[in-house]
Each structure stands twice: as structure tokens, then as C-alpha cells.
Design a protein with these regions (language model features):
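Conserved SAM-binding loop of SAM-dependent methyltransferases across substrates and taxa
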Residues: 108-121, 186-187
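Conserved class I S-adenosyl-L-methionine
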Residues: 96-107
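S-adenosyl-L-methionine
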Residues: 128-178
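N-terminal auxiliary segments of SAM/dcSAM-dependent transferases
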Residues: 1-64
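C-terminal substrate-binding/active-site "lid" region of AdoMet-derived donor-dependent transferases
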Residues: 179-249
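Glycine-rich helix-loop-beta junction characteristic of Rossmann-like nucleotide cofactor-binding loops
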Residues: 91-96, 118, 163-165, 187
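Conserved SAM-binding loop and adjacent beta-strand
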Residues: 2-3, 73-86
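Short beta-strand element of Class I
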Residues: 122-128, 195
Length: 259
């Protein structure tokens, strides 16, 4: 990736109050804000990390968005899985280059984008999404960050009715009743494959764990991730007054070979 901004690039503009704006550069384009106008031509051909001034003199820092920043700013319909959970999902599910993954509950495509970047060009992600409008938005978001040439197949279908693929390495679920998918996952995954589910409530987790316990899974864990920032300014060092606490529970299980 070049360090020079080009037309078509996604750019994150950050003001002195850390407010962020995601734009796509286009020749002759303009970004309008309460602090004035930024002309896209003032960015195209310039190096990443520069400070640009609006027509009213406000200063904005221009950078390419990281995946975490993109997830927080991208268009969404469904609620997204946030970066604090996406990172642990990639580690707990041991998502590796070349992995074959089934994801259900594609939503706005935040986790899909992270999975695709982790598996690289030799892997594949098949997404099941019951709503066509969510599927189309997810595709736009994925392509907006990774480009069009990605190993992704999003299908508008209900995973509760079954999974066609076989020998999957991973099944990743973000839907209300993942226990209805456990049987399908045992048929679709290879031995040693990993099932991971993201759920907002502990009652859902309990129901899922019951179904997992009745299937040939082992090494089962459930956890949640809490994120707390710190205020560091001179001699003033303390935890932030606010933290990103509960967003969801992560449950992970390994498919075993029955005795």
C-alpha cells in the first residue's frame, strides 16, 4: 500500500477533539463539516498523516483508517461486533491463513472483514445471512475496506436449516439461537474444528452450553472482554471515568472425535 493518498482511497479525518469522519476521495470532491470545507484535491497526491485545513482554518489530521477505526465508522444496519471482541474472536477461534470458515449472522460485515484479512487469499469465508439488505450492506462494507477481490461468498439463507459445506475449519455464529446450529456444525466441520458463538445474554449462553454438552465437543470456554482506557497527561495518570464493559459473551468449543 502506498503512503500517498489516491482518488478512491478511504480516508479518516480527525479533528482536535478526536471526532472522526470517514470519506472516500474523489477528484473535485468536497467534505463539508461545521468547521468548514475540506477539498479532496488538497489530499489527493499528498502523504498520509498530513494536517489539512478547512476553509475556516480548522485543522484535521488525515490518515487511512485501521480496521478498528473502519468498523466504528462504516455504514451499518445491524449492530456490529466491536473491535474489543473481534480481536479475541480471531485468537480464540485460531483463525489462520488458508482457513475455511462459515460465518452466520453477517450483519454489517465487521467481523467478516476481519476474518477475511486473517485468512488471506488462500482461505475462504462463506456467509449465511437471512436478510438480503444486510447481506448487500455487508458486501459493500467488506469491499470498501478490502477491495473486490476477496474469497467471500455471502448467501441469503437460514443457517438453522442446515450447512451445505463440509470439512470446515471454523464455524462462527452471531445470531439469536446458535444452539439450533450445533448439530449442523458437527456435520459441517472437520475433527478438531472450532465453533465460536457471540451472544449478548448469559441465558442464551446457558442454552447454547447445554446443546454443546450433548454433542461431541470439548475444551469449552465462555468469557467476556472488558476494555478500560487510561487518562495519561503529565503527572495525572488514572483510569478513564468510563469503560467499554459488557457487549457480549464469547463461547468457544472444539469438535472432538467420539471414542
Amino acid at each position: 500500500m502506498s503512503g500517498i493518498f489516491r482518488a478512491g482511497d478511504r480516508v479518516l479525518l480527525v479533528d482536535n477533539r478526536k471526532r472522526r469522519h470517514l470519506i472516500t476521495l474523489a477528484g473535485g470532491g468536497e467534505f463539508h463539516t461545521h468547521a468548514g470545507i475540506v477539498r479532496h484535491d488538497d489530499l489527493i497526491g499528498k502523504p498520509e498523516g498530513l494536517t489539512v485545513r478547512t476553509t475556516r482554518g480548522a485543522r484535521l489530521t488525515a490518515v487511512r483508517p485501521t480496521l478498528a477505526e473502519y468498523v466504528l465508522e462504516m455504514p451499518r444496519g445491524a449492530q456490529v461486533i466491536y473491535p474489543k471482541d473481534i480481536g479475541p474472536i480471531l485468537i480464540l477461534a485460531d483463525v489462520f491463513p488458508g482457513a475455511r470458515i462459515l460465518e452466520s449472522g453477517v450483519g454489517s460485515g465487521a467481523l467478516t472483514t476481519a476474518l477475511l484479512r486473517a485468512i488471506g487469499p488462500t482461505g475462504s469465508v462463506t456467509g449465511y445471512e437471512i436478510r438480503d439488505d444486510f447481506a448487500q450492506r455487508a458486501l459493500r462494507n467488506v469491499h470498501g475496506f478490502l477491495g473486490d477481490d476477496v474469497p467471500l461468498d455471502v448467501q441469503v439463507r437460514d443457517v438453522y436449516e442446515g450447512i451445505d459445506a463440509r470439512d470446515l475449519d471454523r464455524v462462527v455464529l452471531d445470531l439469536p439461537e446458535p444452539w439450533r446450529v450445533v448439530k449442523h456444525a458437527t456435520e459441517a466441520m472437520r475433527p478438531g474444528g472450532i465453533l465460536l458463538a457471540y451472544l449478548p445474554t448469559i441465558l442464551q449462553v446457558g442454552r447454547l452450553r447445554e446443546e454443546i454438552a450433548a454433542a461431541p465437543f470439548g475444551m469449552v470456554d465462555t468469557l467476556e472482554v472488558l476494555q478500560r482506557g487510561w487518562h495519561v497527561e503529565g503527572q495525572s495518570i488514572r483510569p478513564d471515568h468510563r469503560m467499554v464493559a459488557h457487549t457480549g459473551f464469547l463461547t468457544v468449543a472444539r469438535l472432538l472425535t467420539p471414542e
